[in-house]
């Protein structure tokens, strides 16, 4: 024998199995605490459903409304919230310790764009050959980046050597 399927969403009408409820009518006005059967009758008279809005309250709060419309509004709110939610991405900018001024400006423009879009930026400074003997040049460049972007970004991960590269992560303010 199979158990009856569990219903999703709030309980409504005869599914509300508490003796008393706090009723709010279809106009949003509080009607007070009353027996559940009386609240269901009031909902039927209005041609609407009695929906349990706050089940954990004492007594539970129920509202008279059109359940189909209510469900649609809830779905709409969920979709709006999902649209507004932005996943923060980690964008990477690769630099060299002896980068030319114009090349640096081009990279800086793309970093500005990433910060405007709300993304974090990982700055990877690659050392090759003898450049590895002068990590202070890399540190100087990353300090320049930090100063140039202090109004729009904050340092999330301080400059640090990892193998042949130096890494720093900036996050938008």
From Swiss-Prot:
Q: Where in the cell is it found?
A: Cytoplasm
Keywords in alphabetical order, please.
Answer: Cytoplasm, Initiation factor, Protein biosynthesis
Q: Which Gene3D superfamilies match?
A: Translation initiation factor 3 (IF-3), C-terminal domain, Translation initiation factor 3 (IF-3), N-terminal domain
Under InterPro entries, the record lists:
T_IF-3_C_sf, T_IF-3_N_sf, Translation_initiation_fac3_CS, Translation_initiation_fac_3, Translation_initiation_fac_3_C, Translation_initiation_fac_3_N
Tell me, in one coarse class, where this protein mainly resides.
cytoplasm
Signal peptide location = none
| Name listed for the protein in its UniProt record | Translation initiation factor IF-3
Organism source for this protein? Phenylobacterium zucineum (strain HLK1)
What gene name is listed for this protein? Answer: infC
């Amino acid at each position: 024998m199979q158990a009856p399927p569990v219903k999703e969403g709030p309980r409504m009408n005869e599914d509300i199995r508490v003796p008393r409820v706090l009723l709010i009518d279809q106009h949003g006005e509080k009607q007070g605490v009353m027996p559940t059967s009386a609240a269901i009758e009031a909902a039927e008279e209005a041609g609407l459903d009695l929906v349990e809005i706050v089940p954990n309250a004492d007594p539970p709060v129920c509202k008279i409304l059109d359940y189909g419309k209510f469900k649609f509004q809830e779905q709409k709110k969920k979709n709006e919230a999902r649209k507004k939610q932005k996943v923060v991405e980690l964008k990477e900018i690769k630099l060299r310790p002896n980068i030319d001024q114009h090349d640096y400006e081009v990279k800086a423009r793309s970093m500005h764009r990433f910060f405007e879009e709300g993304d974090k930026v990982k700055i990877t400074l690659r050392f090759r050959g003898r450049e590895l003997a002068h990590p202070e040049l890399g540190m100087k460049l990353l300090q320049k980046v930090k100063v140039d972007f202090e109004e729009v970004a904050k340092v999330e991960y301080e400059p640090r050597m990892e193998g042949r590269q130096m890494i720093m992560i900036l996050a938008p303010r």
